[in-house]
């Protein structure tokens, strides 16, 4: 079984359940005077995380009604649609969202929340399913991606 790299952070108590996913959106204004804010804000903005374990520590928090809890999180895989040219398992890609409008029925799948444009991801699975219509290019393919782990060699052309 693959061991996910985890980080200790603090989340609102309503999110402190294994399997809960969230997208870290950054620091709130109320965090400026908090003495433990550094632990809450050790994640990368815009990335999707999954709670994998709960720790015993709980904290009062001006942002989260009901307080906050210390947890272990790992970056969560995200399903998205990509060009069929790059939809290959175990391929590293630099995400570039297609230029289309929000009226497109596959816009959310091609521009998923939790994926940061310009960052490197690994396609872990090419998922079966119906082809999605696309007005700006070839029908995008549904894949599962994870961020390129830190410490792996990064090729930069």
Curated annotation (Swiss-Prot):
What residue ranges carry the coiled-coil annotation?
Answer: none
Instruction: Give the highest taxon in the source lineage.
Output: Archaea
Q: Which family does it belong to?
A: Belongs to the UPF0179 family.
Name of the protein this chain belongs to = UPF0179 protein Mhun_1135
């Amino acid at each position: 079984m693959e061991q996910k790299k985890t980080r200790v952070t603090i989340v609102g108590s309503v999110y402190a359940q294994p399997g809960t996913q969230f997208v870290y959106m950054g620091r709130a204004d109320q965090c400026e005077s908090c003495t433990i804010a550094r632990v809450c804000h050790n994640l990368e903005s815009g990335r999707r995380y999954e709670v994998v374990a709960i720790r015993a520590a709980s904290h009062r928090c001006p942002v989260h009604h009901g307080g906050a809890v210390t947890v272990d999180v790992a970056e969560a895989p995200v399903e998205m649609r990509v060009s069929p040219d790059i939809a290959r398992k175990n391929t590293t890609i630099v995400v570039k969202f297609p230029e289309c409008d929000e009226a497109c029925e596959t816009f959310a799948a091609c521009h998923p929340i939790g994926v940061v444009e310009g960052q490197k991801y690994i396609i872990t699975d090419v998922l079966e399913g119906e082809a999605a219509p696309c007005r700006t290019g070839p029908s995008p393919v549904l894949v599962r991606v994870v961020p390129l782990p830190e410490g792996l060699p990064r090729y930069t052309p």
